[in-house]
């Protein structure tokens, strides 16, 4: 779950931080992870 999303990154509820390149956004968010618009995956 996303706790905070800003123009330069995302803070997930579990404390993970993911810095995002300009223009990259979350395109899919599930209970176990997220897929970013640049194809990267974040597991939590």
Curated annotation (Swiss-Prot):
It comes from the Eukaryota. The keyword Signal does not apply. Sequence repeats lie at residues 3-20, 27-44. One of its GO terms (molecular function) is structural constituent of cuticle. Calcified shell. InterPro entries: Cuticle_1. Keywords: Cuticle, Repeat. The keyword Repeat applies. It holds the Pfam family Cuticle_1. This is Cuticle protein CP466. The lineage of its organism: Eukaryota, Metazoa, Ecdysozoa, Arthropoda, Crustacea.
């Amino acid at each position: 779950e996303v706790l905070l999303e800003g123009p330069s990154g995302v803070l997930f509820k579990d404390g993970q931080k993911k810095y995002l390149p300009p223009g990259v956004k979350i395109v899919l968010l599930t209970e176990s992870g997220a897929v970013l618009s640049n194809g990267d995956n974040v597991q939590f």
